[in-house]
Amino acid sequence: MTAKSEWIDISYPLSKDMIHWPENPVPPSVESNTFTIKGSSVNVTMSQMTINTHHGTHIDAPRHFFPDGKTIDQMPVDAIMGPARVIEIKDIVSIKPEELADHNIQPGERILFKTVNSSYYQKGKFVEDFVYISTEGAHYLRDKKVSVIGIDYLAIGSFRDKENLVEVHKVLVGNGIWVIEAINLSAVKAGMYEIICLPIKIANGDAAQARAILRPL
């Protein structure tokens, strides 16, 4: 019998039924086709995907908001490999400096935010009022010089407040902070973990899907 792995998969599978940002022009799709290899009797299955680089669990690169910013294929491979801290946020509206101050965040930390958002994927539809990082919270995290931010919904900024959506992204990715969006922390407790999160290597990409896993430390 194989021993149970300590690793926890915190990424969401890509599928046509997955929750996606309503303003993305094309919903994700994965279509499988089976055919026979020419000259043989062997059947193989191959799939074709239609996805936006921000569908599902993904990493934002600076290029997402800055035309001359670093692209996803320029991300150092070890940027999101190593110690990470899961912080549980109690505020059901936004992530604010007042609550962040309780957690003694240190320079260089990789911080993953677990919020009430982790229960929203169970609903099977996009929730507009998800917990996001407030503009002040983004400035606080920038000033703390964190290296990575992860959140358990489709964006770090607000869906309803587009000024916040833009500002939060610019403050964080514009200061060399890598952002992981749409991670599944529903089965993860607050605490210290080892993280491995590697994006697909898309040339000149503004973002890319990633497989993210955690192991308790």
Where are these regions (language model features)?
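Active-/binding-site microenvironments in catalytic and ligand-binding cores
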Residues: M1-L217
